[in-house]
Amino acid sequence: MIKLNTIFDYPNISLHFDLHISLGEKIAIIGESGAGKSTLLNLIAGFEPVKQGEIRLNGENHTYTAPHQRPVSILFQEHNLFTHLTVWQNIAIGLRADLKLSKEEIKQLEKVASAVGLTDFLSRLPKELSGGQRQRVALARCLLRDKPILLLDEPFSALDPHLRQEMLTLIDKFCREKQLTLLLVTHQLSEVIDKIDRIVEIKNGQATEREIPR
């Protein structure tokens, strides 16, 4: 669950977000470039400071907590993989910076890797993977963290339409199985219509709910 009523100031505009998102809801975030879509996700994740207001995640006040203390995983358009680490290590680092996983954590890693189709690539380096495979690694790292809130900031926009659909279907499956709360920033609304519960548009510094075209 996400509840926020916050204000964030840029030099030329003040953003006021007032949202209540229920457990397990899947929300598409739309708006023109520069409207504040990424800022909304960064506020929830703790990467941007709140000027005033409150952010509550899963019933707890996280307005000023550090990003690593929040029940949130976030995936950006850039996959942010470490080029010198293997796929296994790039996934594992989402749990532990020293890569020293317990037996149970290793089992979970292997389970997530299998779910995203990476079982045969765990020993490879990112340079040996396709763009779609690299995004699967980044997604696996998010899912392994097993946080109840998943934030996606156009992570698949650089992929071709077929690969985007594959990734979106995979996300939809995980959200249903784990009852994850999802916020997805997208410019391809038609591709996610059948996978979301609500649309929120960021415009003129405000977050407004829009009707889903069916």
From Swiss-Prot:
Entry binding sites for ATP: G31, E32, S33, G34, A35, G36, K37, S38
InterPro entries in UniProt: AAA+_ATPase, ABC_SmlMolc_Importer, ABC_transporter-like_ATP-bd, ABC_transporter-like_CS, P-loop_NTPase, Thiamine_ABC_ThiQ
Any one GO CC term of the record: plasma membrane
Assigned keywords, A-Z: ATP-binding, Cell inner membrane, Cell membrane, Membrane, Nucleotide-binding, Translocase, Transport
Gene3D superfamilies: P-loop containing nucleotide triphosphate hydrolases (3.40.50.300)
EC number(s) per entry: 7.6.2.15
Pfam annotation, one family: ABC_tran
Domain ABC transporter intervals: 2-212
Coiled coil location: none
Lipid bilayer topology: Peripheral membrane protein
PROSITE patterns found in the cross-reference section: ABC_TRANSPORTER_1, ABC_TRANSPORTER_2, THIQ
Subcellular location: Cell inner membrane
Reactions catalysed: thiamine(out) + ATP + H2O = thiamine(in) + ADP + phosphate + H(+)
Main localization category: membrane
Gene Ontology MF terms in the entry: ABC-type thiamine transporter activity; ATP binding; ATP hydrolysis activity
Source domain of life: Bacteria
Family the UniProt entry places it in: Belongs to the ABC transporter superfamily. Thiamine importer (TC 3.A.1.19.1) family.
Functional description taken from the UniProt entry: Part of the ABC transporter complex ThiBPQ involved in thiamine import. Responsible for energy coupling to the transport system.
Quaternary structure note: The complex is composed of two ATP-binding proteins (ThiQ), two transmembrane proteins (ThiP) and a solute-binding protein (ThiB).
Name listed for the protein in its UniProt record: Thiamine import ATP-binding protein ThiQ
Lineage: Bacteria, Pseudomonadati, Pseudomonadota, Gammaproteobacteria, Pasteurellales
Primary gene name: thiQ
